[in-house]
Each structure stands twice: as structure tokens, then as C-alpha cells.
Amino acid sequence: MIPRVMSVASTDSGGGAGIMADLKTFTALKVFGTAVIVTLTAQNSVSVKSIYELPLKFIDDQFDEILDDIGTDAAKTGMLYSSDIINEVANKFIQYDVKNIVIDPVMISKTNVRLLKEDAIDAMVNKLMKISYLITPNMPEAEVISKTKIKNYNDMKNAAKIIYNNISTNVLIKGGHYNSYFSSDILYDGDEFYEFKMKRVDTKNTHGTGDTLSSAITSYLANGKKLCEAIKLSRGYIEGTIKNSFPMGKGYGPLNHFWVIK
């Protein structure tokens, strides 16, 4: 049977990130994607105009309709926005004993708009992350979660260890915000550090890279890949989406999720 993967996240009316990016990734990597939408956003390549939270009952209904019928082999979260939504999502994951949960703790948009309320951080860390298999914060998000500053590679390793010691979950810190010739991600599994390095591509068409990476990892986990292999394959896929990206709109352009489809 084709692997089943669920995204629990928000829409992006501009099509580059959020559930739109997740479903494109699932399709490109040949898994069956389902979606629980938690907020609607009005945004494009240069701004986020408004955010609308969906009622918790409707979020519950989406979970129930998917998991009572189709089921899932893995799940990922993206923008969840509020503590009420985060607590509800965590409760549904527990209720259905969902495995292979990947948390992308989306906090700030590419256009510098807050996508996670300040008072929701505690629920994100202490309720949702603690039931996950992997979290994938970028450097600014890792600073918030670890309550430390990250200025270099060693700081990334230190932050990853602090986070792991708090939540006992695999931590992948994405190094895309670190200004260097290479983009290095750091995985810490509680015992070892693993580095995943990629030459930086000179383009501003990077909208949705975090969503896409976490979706790709989730897809490979659903296919039975081990964590390090899933990350390595996902970074190869991401490199292709960036190298084959295209301009769309006046700001940060989207990735080309379908570059792998011949």
C-alpha cells in the first residue's frame, strides 16, 4: 500500500509554503497526503495580510475523518499559531497513537510576520514536542526553544543538546540562517551529532524551504527509512527544488517541488 502522510498546518494563499508546499512534496515523493487545516492565511510573496483560526471542533472533525478511515503512517506539523490549537493537535495525536511525528515549529514568516503567538511557545515545547519523533527548528527558532544564542556551529550543537535534554526527542537544527558558503544542518539523537552539509544556492526563491524539508523527511519516514537516511534524501530533494526554483511574485519566490517528476 502507498505510504500515508498527514500534514497538520495552515494554508498559504500564495502557494509557496504551508499545506500547499506539504501536499506538493508528498505528491513529488509518491506518498498519499492528507491535510488537517488549522488556520487560513491571506499572504503572498511579500506579506502576510491576515490569519484566521479555524474552530477547534472543525480541527477535531478533520482528524477524526482522516484517522477513522484512511489512517496515517507519519505526520508533520507546520504553522499552528495558538496554544489552543497546539493542545488540541497534541491530544488528537495521543488519542490516535500517531507515530513518526515531525514538528516544524514555525514561528516567523519569511516576510518577518509572527506565525506563533508568544504564549503558545510553552505548549509547543512542553506538550507537542515531547510526543514527537523529530523537531526541525531553524536557528532563530532553536534560540527561542533552547533560550540560548546561536552564532556558530558549536552554538548549534550546544542548543541541540539543551533542547534534547528538555524534550528527549531527536533535534535537527537547520543552519540556513547562518551566513556561510555551506548550509549545515545538525542532528542530535541524544548520543551522537550528525552534520548534513549542502553548498548554498544563490537565489531568493526559497519560500517554503522549512515546510518542504520537514514534509520530505516525514515522507521518507513513512516509507520506512531510518532517520539519518531520511534527512540525507530530503536534503538532496531540497537542493533540487532550490536549484530548479523560479520567480513568482515580487518577493521570495517558491521552490520547484516537481523537479523530480520526469
Name each model feature, range by range.
Residues 2-7, 27-110, 261:
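Conserved N-terminal subdomain of the carbohydrate kinase-like
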Residues 20-23, 143-144, 203-227:
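Short, small-residue alpha-helix embedded
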Residues 8-14, 193-207:
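Short pre-catalytic strand/loop immediately N-terminal to key active-site residues, enriched for Gly-Thr
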Residues 15-31:
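N-terminal basic/disordered segments at the start of proteins
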Residues 118-193:
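Conserved phosphate/ATP/ADP-binding segment of small-molecule kinases
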